[in-house]
Every structure is written in structure tokens, then in C-alpha cells.
Amino acid sequence: MKVLILGGFLGSGKTTLLLQLARYLVDSSGSGSAYKVVILENEVGREGIDDKLLRGNGFDVENLFNGCACCTLAGELVSAAYEIEKQYTPDWLIVETTGLAYPGLIQDNLAAGIGMESRVCTVVDVSRWKRLLNAMRELFV
């Protein structure tokens, strides 16, 4: 199973990119056979919004509610990824983080917890880039 972690601030376009990417993987894998995709949504609150949109588009979605997968829900993240791999046997797992998450920590937790390799893609709203850079310089590499 390949794992992609999508990070970015609230409103950066993570869900829009996720939806387009998942559609591409399912519809046109290039080899004529579709990839199986499962999405793991992380929400700080008790209920999700994006999971309903993604399910409405025909995707299998699992949720991590009420915390952040990089810290307070790190153990639940590892368990969820392991269970998703066993239950669904997907080709791709796409993890959409909260807008506050550190995607690199999620990547580290998956590697340390179950030896799962992943890639990180950070989504940025270019119209807000300069403001974000100035306000949160210490977060950027």
C-alpha cells in the first residue's frame, strides 16, 4: 500500500486536491486497471464535513476525530492505517491532515509504529503565501 499524507493550512485546497487525485487514481491508472483508494480524514472536531463529500463521491473513508494525528491521536493513526491495510487492502491510502498538523510527524509515526513508508504533499494557497511565510516562518523548512 502506498501512503500519501496531504498537509496544509485550513482553506489551502487539501480536500479539492485529494478529490481530484483520488478520482484520477481510480479512473485512469494508466495501465487500464483502476487503483483502489482509501482516504483517512483527520478532523480536530467531533464531526467531519469533508468525509461526507468524499463518501458522496464514492470513496471509502475512515475518520480520526477530536484531535490531531501528529500528536494527540498518533496511536490511533497508526492503528487506523494498519486496520485499513488489513480490511480494505488498498493500493493507495491518502491521509488528509488537519490544518494544524505537522505532516512530517505523521510520516514519522507511521514509520516508527508499523514500518509504513509514506510521502508528504503540502498544499499552499499561493494568494496567502507571503502572509503565511511572514507569520509562521518557523514552521517552514
Where are these regions (language model features)?
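Nucleotide-state-sensitive switch-loop elements of NTP-binding domains
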Residues: K2-G7, S12, T16-L139
